[in-house]
């Protein structure tokens, strides 16, 4: 069944917000951690993220952000772009209209160097932006044996172009972090990324 045309689109916000799908199993190893570090540009002078025998070997703190796409596979994940949300109150939409929006992460404790974990997700907001719809989710990475002690909490949003105008809430005003006026930077840092980072990043999920 194809997605309805945008003018007929209607979201039931009360059904959607607060929905929690089944926990998602995720698996990773120390090799996955090192591949991720390489894919975000970590250099060889930061061996604590790149070499498993380093005395301070650790996971790069933002690694949980890719686990929702990696899931529990050790192969290459194929992302179909969505379109069928399986969220009560959100009808199907054209997946080609979906783009990534905001992303943030809060770290509560150091990540283990590998193992099996779960992602617990809640639909925390659905907003009508006029020209499109924003779907916001909050996801916690937990050990299934200790679900009350998350390692991290991630908030992400997706913007679906052309699916607005259904009379829903506009959503809260976004925080603005404009640089101070009439003040020079305290420090400046310049770095050159490699051309192949996107190819490496894809392998992390």
Give the ranges of each region predicted by the language model.
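Residue-identity detector for threonine
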Residues: 29, 62, 73, 121-122, ...
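A mid-sequence, solvent-exposed acidic-amphipathic segment
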Residues: 181-205
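HotDog/MaoC-like acyl-thioester-processing domains
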Residues: 2-22, 98-189
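Hydrophobic, proline/glycine-rich low-complexity stretches
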Residues: 2-116
